Amino acid sequence: MLARSAGQYKGHIAVGLVGVPILTDWVIRNKEADFMYDMLKQPDYPGYLHMLNNNATTTWEYWNGERSRVHNCYNGIANWFYQAVGGIRADEKQPGYRHVFIEPQIPQGVTWANTTKESPYGTIIVNWKLQDDCLMMHVVLPVGVEASVAIPVSYTHLRAHETSLHL
């Protein structure tokens, strides 16, 4: 249904700002990184790039820029960047980021990401880049945090450069 809606609106985000967190959750859960990235790249109304092209420094209340231009309360799109592109997701069975899933979803055309997420234990860092058809990942976990790491199937080589790696 979302794909059909995006097609109907010529690839644009087809929800209001209140619907963005719902869309974002669906995209992350269904690993539809290209779907979201294609919508984010649309330069005209309605969309985030439209806001940026019109000098926005915060999320607007309405896609067209009417009314408040400082309306961060519905900025659910940020979740997509650190949960999908960065790949940092909390394990709902172990609240408080005691255990996290590291599983980057790499949209076509994106070649790197530097992602941090503050947790009660400290900063979780996932930096990755594509180089020569190889995915290079750097993951830093604070003491007290465990992670399950999943590498996208397109990139199957793994090389450990840190003190320990348990697979």
Which residues does each PLM region occupy?
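Alpha-helix capping and helix-loop boundary segments enriched in small/acidic/polar residues
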Residues: K10-V15, V27, S68-R69
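Extended glycan-interaction surfaces of carbohydrate-active proteins
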Residues: M1-V20, D38, D44-Y45, T59
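Well-ordered alpha-helical scaffold segments within catalytic/enzyme domains
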Residues: I22-N30, Y82-G87
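Conserved small/polar residues in nucleotide/adenosyl-binding loops
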Residues: M1-L2, T156-T163
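Non-catalytic C-terminal accessory modules of carbohydrate-active enzymes
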Residues: D34-R159
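Conserved structured core elements
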Residues: A14-L17, N30-D34, N75
